[in-house]
Amino acid sequence: MSKRKKLLVMAGGTGGHVFPAIAVAQYLQKQDWDICWLGTRDRMEAKLVPKHGIPIEFIQISGLRGKGLITLLKAPFVILRAVLQARKIIKKYQPDVVLGMGGYVSGPGGVAAKLCNIPVVVHEQNAVLGLTNSLLAKIATRVLQAFPNTFPNAEVVGNPVREAFFSVPMPQERFNTTCETLKVLVVGGSQGAHILNTILPEVLAQLPNRLEIVHQVGSGSVENVTALYHDKVNLTQESVQITEFIDDIAQAYAWADIVICRSGALTVCELAAVGTPAIFVPFQHKDKQQYLNAKYLADVGAAYIVEQHELDAEKIAQLLKNVDKEKLLEMAEKAKNMSTPLSTQRVAEVIMDTVKT
């Protein structure tokens, strides 16, 4: 009987790195691969990965951007320690290949793999290249990207997303073009987005009889946001539902006629997978990462972009006034056409091919 192939997954820090990596890991588990994860104890992967039945090992590493002089002076020693820790784990686990999907942990892990002559596959989730992946790409066996032109010559494979996002009904089945009420989902991410929480009650006040809103406000914000809605409108259970978190975000996207949200790479690709239009409010960052992610759908007419410095209730209300169900269905179909349903499979195939060659 042939020996099971082994993959070491290196991803951490945020859901945008961790969830696509979990999708690939689970796909390969079904192909009888053995999976181990390299992460850090203080980030989300420490709790999330074991819940998905994947063993995890830890190294000590954190980000260096924006840190003080003392931290930067210590950086070479911190990185060297992390590389040695990763090398020890690799020597023990003996993977056939490692997959780097971003986050601080990928850097030391990728260097350690190269030192051990283990093939490295890199996947970049964002439209703007991350620092870790820009360095890892120089030593990688294969480089993959979610969006075109992040790397000059890498294969475009999309972002792996969970099967649940492709299992909802198609846009043509979901959109009721005779209903005047717009179902609006507002998502600020797990921490909420304060500016969206503040502005949406004002938007509803301008369109009191047109909107049905589900608003995910983030941890600890329900009471404050409920009060804001009460100040602006005669709040009813039918018009607004306010919640800290949404357990089944795929079904929530499928329920909505339009989503108002940030534009992290995973969010953009999940909305494309479901086929739901969006108003993106990109998080302001010097490299415009979220803005460029959002353009993937906005450039084909599947979404609108409102930059944060231009954001006000009147602008959002005007966008919602100007769309009818026929227009939203057209946008939804354009979003669906930009989805990459074979992304998880393709990343897994590249990993398997790397071992064969």
From Swiss-Prot:
KW Transferase (keyword) present: yes
InterPro entries: GlcNAc_MurG, Glyco_trans_28_C, GlycoTrans_28_N
Primary location group: membrane
Gene Ontology biological process: carbohydrate metabolic process; cell division; cell wall organization; lipid glycosylation; peptidoglycan biosynthetic process; regulation of cell shape
Main enzyme class: transferase
Catalytic activity: di-trans,octa-cis-undecaprenyl diphospho-N-acetyl-alpha-D-muramoyl-L-alanyl-D-glutamyl-meso-2,6-diaminopimeloyl-D-alanyl-D-alanine + UDP-N-acetyl-alpha-D-glucosamine = di-trans,octa-cis-undecaprenyl diphospho-[N-acetyl-alpha-D-glucosaminyl-(1->4)]-N-acetyl-alpha-D-muramoyl-L-alanyl-D-glutamyl-meso-2,6-diaminopimeloyl-D-alanyl-D-alanine + UDP + H(+)
Lipid metabolism in keyword set: no
Pathway the protein takes part in: Cell wall biogenesis; peptidoglycan biosynthesis
Pfam family, one: Glyco_tran_28_C
Taxonomic superkingdom: Bacteria
Gene3D superfamilies associated with the record: Glycogen Phosphorylase B (3.40.50.2000)
Subcellular location: Cell inner membrane
Binding annotation for UDP-N-acetyl-alpha-D-glucosamine: T14, G15, G16, N126, R162, S190, I246, A265, L266, T267, V268, C269, E270, Q290
Membrane topology, as annotated: Peripheral membrane protein
MF-aspect GO terms: UDP-N-acetyl-D-glucosamine:N-acetylmuramoyl-L-alanyl-D-glutamyl-meso-2,6-diaminopimelyl-D-alanyl-D-alanine-diphosphoundecaprenol 4-beta-N-acetylglucosaminlytransferase activity; undecaprenyldiphospho-muramoylpentapeptide beta-N-acetylglucosaminyltransferase activity
GO cellular component, one term: plasma membrane
UniProtKB keywords: Cell cycle, Cell division, Cell inner membrane, Cell membrane, Cell shape, Cell wall biogenesis/degradation, Glycosyltransferase, Membrane, Peptidoglycan synthesis, Transferase
EC number: 2.4.1.227
Family: Belongs to the glycosyltransferase 28 family. MurG subfamily.
Stated role: Cell wall formation. Catalyzes the transfer of a GlcNAc subunit on undecaprenyl-pyrophosphoryl-MurNAc-pentapeptide (lipid intermediate I) to form undecaprenyl-pyrophosphoryl-MurNAc-(pentapeptide)GlcNAc (lipid intermediate II).
Name of the molecule in the record: UDP-N-acetylglucosamine--N-acetylmuramyl-(pentapeptide) pyrophosphoryl-undecaprenol N-acetylglucosamine transferase
